[in-house]
């Protein structure tokens, strides 16, 4: 037996899911385009920081996606990388040089141009970080060497080693483009949404930090992803984010008609909202699945046999079937099934308690008097947060 002390353990780590939201309206109403008005969106948690590489945290990404554009767009159906702020691009044979042609006429909401120089500064920051401003390196950019502005609308990026994932990296939330004024701010100042100047379809109008955020549509927006059917400014006039931590309060507000969209619906609440005609949108990640991550400096799990034993001792199928719904499919790999390069690794992730026990025996962890595995006087007891 391995004991795990749960502090704030996310059981969803065993599932392949990005986030679940509920949309007001029926399936037929969803096809009708609403023009004008302000969408009321209830968010479970407040955003923490809007430095674009911090966009992997859902509340951060939800804001950044509305106020920033990306160099490229990944089609969610085909997974192809398509033009957005970049009209076109070329990559050399060993993927160490990328050249992008920038769409003309794009501006940030402060009126400054989103040109090659601005793109270069963004990726120099994301690829190298800025120690003076405490801005960290983006997790999706590796081997970055630097940039060169070829002309006002052409920028070239250089890498120390082949970086085949960079093109896809330019399409993710964490690569949102912001103005030079925003990039000049220290990391700690970027939690203030009113200071984030992007080129996206919405701009921040006001904020009550940690409680409420109001956005308004940018009337002159006309540079969305080139292949999308809708072009031009957003159909909505605005979006109002309201931080509402309690699950029951969010659902109650939705059912009472006080909200249009709520994020984070627990599996046990899904039937309730669906029975009222609401639409559940459960988008899976197109990158890395939710995972349990071990600290490599923890001596209890430094032996790979112990980590493998934990994997095979966990009945993920039973957990998903008991605690979740069909919207939480069991992960078949560290990479999502909708991501490029996915390979089904189910056989290597299988529940096998006999194998887990054998691995622990081989690693020297024997069963003690309490029924817990122990070694050198220490019990195999882990804390998970």
Regions found by a protein language model. Name each.
Residues 31, 101, 136-184, 201-208:
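Surface-exposed binding/hinge segments that line
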Residues 219-222, 302-385:
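Append "and occasionally in soluble cytosolic enzymes with long acidic Gly/Pro-rich linkers
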Residues 87-132, 150, 156-158, 300-302:
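Aromatic- and charge-enriched surface segment that lines or borders ligand/interaction sites
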Residues 2-14:
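Bacterial N-terminal signal peptides that target proteins for export
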Residues 42-93, 124, 197:
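N-terminal lobe/hinge region of extracytoplasmic solute-binding protein
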Residues 75-76, 171-240, 248-249, 353-358:
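Gly/Pro-rich hinge or "lid" segments in bacterial periplasmic/extracellular proteins
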Residues 128-129, 136, 147, 205-216, ...:
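Extracellular/periplasmic solute-recognition and catalytic clefts
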Residues 35-45, 87, 97-100, 119-123, ...:
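Short, well-ordered beta-strand elements
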């Amino acid at each position: 037996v391995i004991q795990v002390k749960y502090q704030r353990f996310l059981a969803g780590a065993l599932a392949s899911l990005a986030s679940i939201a509920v949309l007001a309206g029926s399936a037929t109403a969803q096809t009708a385009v609403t023009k004008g008005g302000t969408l009321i969106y209830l968010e479970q948690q407040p955003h923490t920081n809007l430095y674009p590489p911090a966009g992997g945290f859902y509340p951060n990404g939800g804001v950044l996606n509305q106020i920033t554009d990306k160099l490229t767009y990944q089609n969610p159906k085909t997974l192809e990388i398509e033009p957005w702020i970049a009209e076109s691009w070329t990559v050399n044979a060993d993927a160490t040089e990328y050249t992008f042609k920038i769409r003309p006429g794009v501006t940030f909401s402060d009126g400054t141009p989103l040109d090659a120089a601005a793109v270069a500064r963004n990726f120099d920051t994301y690829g190298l970080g800025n120690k003076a401003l405490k801005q960290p390196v983006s997790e999706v950019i590796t081997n970055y060497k630097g940039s060169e502005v070829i002309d006002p609308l052409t920028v070239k990026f250089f890498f120390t080693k082949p970086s085949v994932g960079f093109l896809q990296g330019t399409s993710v939330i964490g690569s949102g483009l912001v103005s030079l004024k925003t990039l000049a701010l220290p990391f700690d100042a970027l939690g203030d949404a009113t200071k984030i100047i992007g080129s996206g379809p919405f701009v921040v109008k006001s904020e009550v930090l940690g409680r409420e955020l109001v956005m308004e549509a940018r009337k002159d927006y006309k540079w969305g992803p080139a292949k999308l059917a809708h072009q031009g400014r957003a159909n909505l006039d605005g979006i109002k984010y309201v931080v509402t931590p309690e699950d029951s309060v969010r659902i109650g507000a939705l059912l009472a008609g006080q909200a249009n969209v709520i994020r984070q619906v627990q599996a046990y609440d899904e039937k309730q909202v669906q029975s009222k005609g609401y639409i559940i949108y459960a988008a899976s990640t197109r990158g890395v699945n939710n995972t349990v991550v071990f600290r490599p400096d923890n001596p209890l799990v430094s032996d790979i046999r112990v980590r493998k034993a934990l994997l095979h001792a966990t009945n993920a199928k039973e957990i998903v079937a008991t605690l979740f719904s069909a919207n939480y499919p069991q992960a078949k790999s560290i990479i999502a099934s909708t991501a490029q390069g996915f390979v089904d690794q189910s056989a290597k992730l299988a529940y096998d308690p006999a194998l887990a026990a054998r691995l622990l025996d081989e690693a020297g962890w024997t069963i003690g008097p309490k029924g817990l595995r122990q070694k050198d006087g220490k019990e195999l007891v882990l804390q998970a947060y």
